[in-house]
Each structure stands twice: as C-alpha cells, then as structure tokens.
C-alpha cells in the first residue's frame, strides 16, 4: 500500500492538470484522500501506478495512509485509442459486458457504515443519490452484503444511472448496476462467475455476453441505443468498444470541422472516442492530437500561473493581491486569467472549480489557440 501511495503522490507533483488529489472529511470525522486526473497523455499513463489514479481513495492519519478505503477500476481505454489497446489479439477476449452510460460509484466503509463515493468525491450529487438507493429498505440485503465485502477488504464498483443523470442514453429509473468487485490491497478482481453465484448481488449485476461471432466488433460499432461494451481479456485486463451511434451523439463527429467544437470535445473528455473512431484516418487522428496538445499545454501553463500566484499572495490584502494578480496575468499575456485568480481570493474551495473557469475562458478565446495549419 505504501509504495502505491508514494507513487500516486509523486504523480501529483509533476502537473496538477494531469494528476491531483483532494482531501475530504466524512460525517464520522475520518479524513480521506482521493487520487484522480484531469487530462493525461499516453506517456503519462506509463508512469508507475498512473493507471490507478482514477478515484482510488485512502483513509488518512495526517499525511500517513491508514488503508486503501476504496479501489475503483484502473484506467482503461478504447480499442485502438493508444498503444495500450493496439495490436490486441482478439482471440484472447474472454467475454464482453454492457457498457452502462452513467457515473461510476464505489463502496467504502466509513466506521461501521457502508457508503458510496464517486470518482472524485464522497459528497458529490451522484454519491449522495446512490447512498439514498442503498438506504432504501428494498435494498437492505444488498447494503448488508456490500458492508460484509467492505469489511473483508473489497470494493464494489457500480454504475449509477438516473433520468436526472443523463449522459446520452435515457434511463427511466434511478438505479445502481454492479460492474465488478475488486480487492483493495492487491487490485485483483473477483470473477464474474463468482459474483453471479451470489444471490444477493446477482440482481444488480451488469449483463454479460459470450462472443459468438468473429464480427462482434463490427456489430458493436454498428449498434444503436447502446453506449458499447467493455471487453474482458483472459488475463483480466479491459478495453472499451463504443458504438458509432453513441460517439456521434456524445462527441459530435462533426466537431472535426469546427475548431471550437473540437476544443469543446477535448475539454469534455470525449476526444478519446473520436481518436478511436478515426484510428485509421491519419490526418484526422493527427488533427485531434494537435488540438489536444495545444489545449493541454495551455492548461498546464494556466493552472500553474493561477495557483502559483494565489499561493504566493493569498495572505495579502485584497488591493495588493489584485495588483499582483493583474501583473502576473498581463505579464504572461493571459489577461483573461485575472478574474480566475481573483475568484480564488474570494474563496473558491476546489481545483475542480478553478479548472471549470479555465476551461470556459479558453473556449471564449479559442481562436487564439488553433494549431498552425488547421
């Protein structure tokens, strides 16, 4: 555990736009640290334990990790999105699972209470609504079983879906769908068959399909009214296949012809879908990567400038702080960041809010950043 924690802390030192952590205190008074990411490239994911920086949560005692409290799935990618999922022997696919279109929520034990966290928070709207489902008397057997699993050191990962949590697909009721169960210390997964044998977990379990056609990938891409599938390899690794129908709605295929829409797709985290769709189109693939690189370089610089300025001057009076902020933003040729630096002084309490402001300001000024040749 300590080595994993140290590697995750090291990742967060490099660039806050890539990997970061946030601390929060639960209702029981316990402190938790969640490691996650904003944007990262293939080379970033090659770093030690980077793939685990996707919502893993530690209970903390000061700066010392006490235990891994929750372990979501590691980061995995679309087929042909990057070298991780290129040249895969498809004969090694064991089975496929329906890819649900909601928000990941994962269990953790807070004292003697079983609760959900989302990818980045123990207090997000999705986590709180999922907790509400768990507390419903109709799900008391599930709640008791998940608590037993957590006490034994396992995380149950679910997809939270609801009419009010729509991404692309419309769900008619609020529910949680069990994706997998993972051992906190080792990261190993309980097999689908073993989960299916559990009469309490089975009704919540995501649907599995055996591969019965050599053209299953083509059929998956041509499917409609579904996000896609998660393919599980015989060695336990995963990759995603998304339907062209879903990608066209989520990331808007037409965004390739519109710089503003393409930047928006990147900011929304949907460029991976586009790259997978255009894996065989060299010009389009390189265009997406060029826009990605431009935005990520900007984000690195902007986030560092904003946070560094605030950290250096936050103890000063408002007038002095404003003068320093104005000088920093103007000196960097990024006057539009002045308002964000001032927002920090006024009490922005999370990097997520800062990121949102930077993203919105970038889109307002996107014409300045269109890569040469496009």
Curated annotation (Swiss-Prot):
Changing residue 182 to A: Complete loss of ligation. The record marks 159, 246 as: Essential for RNA ligase activity. Changing residue 37 to A: No effect on the ligation of 5'-PO4 and 3'-OH termini of the RNA strand and on tRNA repair. This is RNA ligase 1. Changing residue 75 to A: 95% loss of adenylyltransferase activity. Impaired ligase activity. Its EC number is 6.5.1.3. It comes from Enterobacteria phage T4. The lineage of its organism: Viruses, Duplodnaviria, Heunggongvirae, Uroviricota, Caudoviricetes. Belongs to the Tequatrovirus RNA ligase 1 family. Changing residue 159 to A: Complete loss of ligation of 5'-PO4 and 3'-OH termini of the RNA strand and complete loss of tRNA repair. Changing residue 77 to A: 90% loss of adenylyltransferase activity. Impaired ligase activity. Optimum pH is 8.0. Involved in countering a host defense mechanism which, following viral infection, activates the host anticodon nuclease and shuts off viral translation. Repairs 5'-PO4 and 3'-OH groups in the cleaved host tRNA. The nick ligation reaction entails three nucleotidyl transfer steps. In the first step, the RNA ligase reacts with ATP in the absence of nucleic acid to form a covalent ligase-AMP intermediate and release pyrophosphate. In step 2, the ligase-AMP binds to the nicked duplex nucleic acid and transfers the adenylate to the 5'-PO4 terminus to form an adenylylated nicked intermediate.
């Amino acid at each position: 555990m300590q080595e994993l924690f140290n590697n995750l802390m090291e990742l967060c030192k490099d660039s806050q736009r890539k990997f970061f952590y946030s601390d929060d205190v639960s209702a029981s008074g316990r402190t938790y640290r969640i490691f996650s990411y904003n944007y990262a490239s293939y080379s970033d994911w090659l770093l030690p334990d980077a793939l685990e920086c996707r919502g893993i949560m530690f209970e903390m005692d000061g700066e010392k990790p006490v235990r891994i409290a929750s372990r979501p799935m590691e980061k995995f990618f679309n087929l042909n999105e990057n070298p991780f999922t290129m040249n895969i022997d498809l004969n090694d696919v064991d089975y496929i699972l329906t890819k649900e279109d909601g928000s990941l929520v994962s269990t953790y034990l807070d004292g003697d209470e079983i609760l959900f966290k989302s990818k980045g928070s123990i207090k997000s709207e999705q986590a709180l609504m999922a907790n509400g489902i768990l507390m419903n008397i109709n799900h008391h057997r599930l709640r008791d079983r998940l608590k037993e699993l957590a006490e034994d050191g396992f995380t149950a990962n679910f997809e939270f879906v609801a009419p009010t949590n729509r991404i692309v697909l419309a769900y008619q009721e609020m529910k949680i769908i069990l994706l997998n169960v993972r051992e906190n210390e080792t990261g190993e997964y309980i097999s689908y068959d073993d989960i299916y044998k559990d009469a309490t977990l089975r009704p919540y379990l995501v649907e599995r399909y055996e591969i019965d056609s050599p053209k299953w990938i083509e059929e998956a891409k041509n499917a409609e009214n579904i996000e896609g599938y998660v393919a599980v390899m015989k060695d336990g690794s995963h990759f995603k296949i998304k339907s062209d129908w879903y990608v066209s709605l989520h990331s808007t295929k037409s965004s390739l012809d519109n710089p503003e829409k393409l930047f928006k797709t990147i900011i929304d985290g949907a460029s991976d879908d586009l790259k997978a769709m255009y894996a065989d189109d060299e010009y389009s693939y390189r265009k997406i990567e060029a826009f990605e690189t431009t935005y990520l370089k900007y984000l690195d610089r902007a986030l560092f400038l904003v946070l560094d300025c605030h950290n250096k001057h936050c103890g000063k009076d408002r007038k002095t702080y404003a003068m320093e902020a104005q000088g920093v933003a103007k000196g960097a040729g990024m006057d539009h960041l002045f308002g964000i630096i001032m927002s920090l002084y006024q009490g922005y309490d999370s990097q997520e809010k800062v990121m949102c402001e930077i993203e919105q300001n970038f889109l307002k000024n996107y014409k300045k950043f269109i890569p040469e040749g496009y």
